[in-house]
Amino acid sequence: MVMRKLQLPLSQTQKVRFERAIERLQSLSSSANSDASVIVTDSIPVNHDDAFLKGHGTSEVDGELLATVCGVVERVDKLVYVRTLRARYKPEVGDIVVGRVIEVAQKRWRVELNFNQDGVLMLSSMNMPDGIQRRRTSVDELNMRNIFVEHDVVCAEVRNFQHDGSLQLQARSQKYGKLEKGQLLKVDPYLVKRSKHHFHYVESLGIDLIIGCNGFIWVGEHVEVRDPMAIDDQKDEEMISSSSTGKEQSHIPLETRQTICRIGNAIRVLSNLGFTVTLEVIMETVNLSNSKNIDIHDMLGSEFHVVVAENEAERRRTKRKK
């Protein structure tokens, strides 16, 4: 486990507490994982009697296997490689991603995904606003800006890779599409682990949380996923809605906005500490801030970072005992 150095001013007491918490975390991590954290030129233990394959991040020098990058040693059968930390997003087909539209082009939107290439969302690869499955027409192409414009935040799924290395996205489900009434956060992609569920609804708080595999995380007011038939039935009503009604619909209650900010700051703290970002850890951090009556803006201070590190060490120790 590679911990980050906290870039915040700490008092002498806070520094001692923080270092003690990090030592506990590192001891728990090293005893729980067989994977070894390495830096450049570290020796990687291998059995030379058995054949092994040198993978990415390794090099053999004088019969010894050395790491050429910082990261965690991974072994797949005979292959030995080093998984780098703090690297850019490495996409896989089926990944749930959150991104920001940077260009509206011919029959497509280009989306920034924290990857070395932009994602491409084709007009034909998403549900139309009317919810009807049909061929896309020239009228649909002319109305593309009514769906997404530059700087819109969207959620989609990685469909495949194009010949130029860019990602082809798809948003054919009602759970994908434009994200509104919330905030977008960015963490290092290695802090997000792929799982079966990346869409979360925190019912007690009325908040939607989308943890993108690319390190972009969306925190927003809960939005019900509407059935396509319901969308079609409400189409006429939406067409006659007034601008004042639209303003009312865009209003977010103060309590909801405060909750979004609290969850957002919890994610920022976890990112600063280099902790894996999961729903469980996020909500525990939020509950910790509430139990200690810490204001939203104070969550980004040094003291709360130390408290979170101590709490995470205790959580992992308790979890290991079970």
From Swiss-Prot:
GO terms for cellular component: cytoplasm; exosome (RNase complex); nucleolus; nucleoplasm. The keyword RNA-binding applies. Keywords: Cytoplasm, Exosome, Nucleus, RNA-binding, rRNA processing. Disruption phenotype: Embryonic lethality due to embryo developmental arrest at early globular stage. SMART domains: S1 (SM00316). The keyword Repeat does not apply. It is found in: Cytoplasm; Nucleus, Nucleolus; Nucleus. The two RNA-binding domains (S1 motif and KH domain) are separated by a conserved linker of five amino acids (KYGKL) and can bind RNA independently. Both domains are also needed for RNA degradation and interaction with RRP41, another exosome subunit. Belongs to the RRP4 family. Non-catalytic component of the RNA exosome complex which has 3'->5' exoribonuclease activity and participates in a multitude of cellular RNA processing, maturation and degradation events. In vitro, is an active and distributive 3'->5' exonuclease requiring a free 3'-OH on the substrate and releasing nucleoside 5'-monophosphates. Required for normal embryo development. This is Exosome complex component RRP4 homolog. It comes from Arabidopsis thaliana. The gene is RRP4.
